[in-house]
């Protein structure tokens, strides 16, 4: 974050927190909809998987999920323009994760990131030693709480973005891994090399006081540009 930028931390709302937990569960292969009991869970395996993810890695993937979903939303909105009577629709993941700011390592959803150390922030996870770990107590109730607080539209948006990205690879790396399997460093590199008018403008020149989400609201064409630059990084 640019030195001197005001930092107004607010508590993260339940819907956003639950959506983030659903997103994390999706990444590590924990299917909450199947509602497995603790006995059926391989907790050690899941925690080993969780240990591979820094919060920076989550933030970059979350941003890429939001861009992928926004591309779908733009397409759907164009179709709705042809069908004006169809007005009930979800605004997409960028309306849920609506507080991205430009940090040193790329876009960060501030409400999630800055509250991660708060006890009780997450239902399914604790945050220990820089990593999320699965809570073992009352797992079924906690899983159901996440599902109840994450709308079906948001679940579908996360599922859809996951399905689209799981077979996408990064052009900058020849290792053949899906973008979802890449480590933190290449994800940060991608985030730094999207539209020059988004993260660089917000981070280095304090555009919109570093608030990427606000930038997208005020200059919608920059969201389109960011999506196109992200798509150009994939194969």
Where are these regions (language model features)?
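Domain-edge interaction signal
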Residues: 1-235
């Amino acid at each position: 974050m640019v030195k001197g930028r005001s930092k107004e931390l607010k508590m993260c709302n339940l819907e956003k927190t639950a959506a983030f937990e659903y997103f994390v569960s999706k990444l590590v292969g924990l299917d909450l909809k199947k509602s497995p009991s603790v006995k059926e869970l391989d907790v050690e395996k899941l925690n080993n998987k969780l240990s591979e993810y820094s919060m920076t890695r989550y933030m970059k993937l979350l941003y890429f999920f939001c861009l992928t979903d926004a591309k779908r939303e733009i397409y759907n909105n164009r179709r709705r323009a042809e069908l004006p009577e169809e007005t009930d629709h979800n605004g997409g993941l960028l309306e849920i994760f609506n507080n991205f700011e430009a940090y040193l390592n790329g876009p960060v959803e501030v409400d999630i990131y800055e509250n991660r150390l708060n006890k009780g922030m997450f239902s399914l996870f604790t945050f220990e030693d820089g990593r999320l770990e699965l809570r073992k107590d009352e797992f079924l109730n906690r899983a159901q709480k996440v599902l109840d607080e994450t709308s079906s539209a948001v679940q579908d948006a996360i599922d859809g973005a996951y399905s689209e990205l799981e077979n996408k690879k990064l052009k900058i790396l020849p290792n053949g891994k899906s973008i979802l399997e890449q480590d933190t460093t290449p994800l940060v590199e991608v985030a730094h090399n999207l539209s020059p008018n988004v993260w660089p403008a917000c981070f280095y020149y304090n555009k919109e006081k570093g608030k990427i989400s606000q930038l997208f609201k005020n200059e919608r064409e920059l969201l389109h540009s960011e999506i196109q630059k992200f798509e150009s990084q994939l194969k």
